[in-house]
Amino acid sequence: MEKHLITNDRVRHVPRQFSWVDHRLVRGNYLMKASAPAWALYLVLVTVGDEQGLSYYADRTLARLLSLHEESITEARRQLIEAGVIAYEAPLYQVLGLEPGGFERVEEVAS
């Protein structure tokens, strides 16, 4: 398929304060290691983190931003830690660099 712009007046440009989501989340099967709410939390952490992936948002704030209960933030954080994509030392989060190999494909998504 040949790609083309669908909407010319809204082309993305790299902003001065820039963060990225590593394509290895998909290609390395990381997405299968956590639930959708966990990946929503990850997206917020990637977006608000500094150049080293560090941020310190309170669970209450994260829950409000994501329309989740604080208990859901706790579970989402646990899943992301288990998936090896973040580290947490209250109140500090660190989005980690992804391992080159990723994971083998699994059948069941974490709940």
Regions found by a protein language model. Give the residues of each.
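Winged helix-turn-helix DNA-binding recognition segment
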Residues: 31, 37, 47-101
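Short, amphipathic alpha-helical interaction segments positioned at domain boundaries
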Residues: 100-111
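Short recognition helix of helix-turn-helix/winged-helix DNA-binding domains
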Residues: 1-53
